[in-house]
């Protein structure tokens, strides 16, 4: 058997990131051949990664990297939040975002083939990370945004990277772009404007809002409060010219019935129409950026605030770690038992 030195073990560990015992075993198996030992480490790493492939990785971090007029945002998952706070994991996330920004891949398949700063492919980096960290580490998704010289990136990460936002703003400055990114992190809009909402989605959301009104009305009835009416519309997309014209006619009829003189109608109608628009765009307010009240100035919507500073949002991406992933629920005893088996 070859005589394995501490220097060889150290060199192999620095090259592969393997643990002390794994490095020593690989060198023994390779009879001191460093190149063969590296191959053994990688082979065993792939085997470990394969065993963990079916595990659910729903924790992790987002990463953002800005390089001139190109920026990338990524989500990288681990099985536990503890590992997500590991420095090796954080480095992997940051290097992934950098690699994506510089490579500008079209999809995950192209992304996995890109070369990381370490010289290995992104896919190899994740196989090796799974082996050395001891949990399933997976590259989930990414987005690449580009801007012109006159536009600004707004990048923001909340809760240590649990939520990541990247936005492109026309006009204003970098501070405004970051504030918009912070708003997006807090209010989680799905799209920029009502024009991007699917009609079926609007109908479903409107039905949910009316279901909530029904529940509220049950409580109101118990204390003899009048029932709230159902919402007929939920989005600007549903408010056609005919609908708006009819709403104005209804307001005029209401004012006439109340005996309000026609000479003051022009002062009353705009406010009532604004209220009509507010009451009938609830789906927009919950799901579209421009219709939301701006967190930095809640007297205005985001759209109104941007207009006041002569700016506009070109695009945005918001990633929240684990969203859409069904997490496995285990009690503490089961978790400990599972760890003892591994």
From Swiss-Prot:
Sorted UniProt keywords: Cytoplasm, Elongation factor, Protein biosynthesis
Entries under Pfam families matching the protein: EF_TS
SUPFAM superfamilies named in the record: Elongation factor Ts (EF-Ts), dimerisation domain, UBA-like
S-adenosyl-L-methionine found in the keyword field: no
CDD domains found in the cross-reference section: UBA_EF-Ts
Compartment(s) where it occurs, according to its Swiss-Prot or TrEMBL record: Cytoplasm
Chief location: cytoplasm
Cysteine disulfide links: none
Any Gene Ontology CC annotation: cytoplasm
One example GO MF annotation: translation elongation factor activity
Source organism superkingdom: Bacteria
UniProt key word Protein biosynthesis: yes
PANTHER family for the chain: ELONGATION FACTOR TS, ELONGATION FACTOR TS, MITOCHONDRIAL
Assigned protein family: Belongs to the EF-Ts family.
Function noted in UniProt: Associates with the EF-Tu.GDP complex and induces the exchange of GDP to GTP. It remains bound to the aminoacyl-tRNA.EF-Tu.GTP complex up to the GTP hydrolysis stage on the ribosome.
Protein name: Elongation factor Ts
Species in which this protein is naturally found: Lactobacillus delbrueckii subsp. bulgaricus (strain ATCC 11842 / DSM 20081 / BCRC 10696 / JCM 1002 / NBRC 13953 / NCIMB 11778 / NCTC 12712 / WDCM 00102 / Lb 14)
């Amino acid at each position: 058997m070859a005589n394995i030195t501490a220097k060889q073990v150290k060199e192999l560990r620095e090259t592969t990131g393997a643990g002390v015992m794994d490095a020593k075993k690989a060198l023994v198996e390779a009879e001191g051949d460093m190149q063969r030992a590296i191959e053994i480490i990688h082979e065993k790493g792939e085997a470990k990664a394969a065993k963990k492939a079916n595990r659910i990785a729903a924790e992790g971090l987002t990463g953002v990297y800005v390089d001139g007029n190109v920026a990338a945002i990524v989500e990288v998952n681990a099985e536990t939040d503890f590992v997500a706070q590991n420095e090796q994991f954080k480095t992997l996330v940051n290097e992934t975002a950098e690699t994506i920004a510089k490579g500008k891949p079209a999809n995950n398949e192209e992304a996995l083939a890109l070369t990381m700063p370490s010289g290995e492919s992104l896919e190899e980096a994740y196989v090796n990370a799974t082996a050395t960290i001891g949990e399933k580490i997976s590259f989930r998704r990414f987005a690449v945004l580009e801007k012109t010289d006159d536009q600004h990136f707004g990048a923001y990460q909340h809760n240590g990277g649990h939520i990541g936002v990247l936005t492109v703003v026309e006009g204003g400055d970098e501070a405004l772009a970051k504030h918009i990114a912070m708003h997006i992190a807090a209010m989680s809009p799905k799209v920029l404007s009502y024009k991007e909402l699917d009609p079926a989605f609007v109908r479903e959301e409107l039905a949910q809002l009316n279901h909530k009104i029904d529940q509220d009305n049950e409580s109101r009835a118990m204390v003899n409060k009048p029932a709230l009416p159902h919402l007929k519309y939920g989005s600007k997309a549903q408010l056609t010219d005919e609908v708006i014209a009819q709403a104005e006619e209804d307001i005029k009829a209401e004012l006439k019935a109340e005996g309000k003189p026609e000479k003051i109608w022009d002062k009353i109608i705009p406010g009532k129409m604004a209220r009509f628009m507010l009451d009938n765009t609830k789906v927009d307010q919950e799901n579209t950026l421009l219709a939301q009240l701006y967190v930095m100035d809640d007297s205005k919507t985001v759209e109104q605030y941007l207009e006041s500073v002569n700016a506009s949002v070109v695009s945005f991406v918001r990633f929240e770690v684990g969203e859409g992933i069904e997490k496995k629920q285990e009690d503490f005893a089961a978790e400990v038992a599972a760890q003892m088996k591994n």
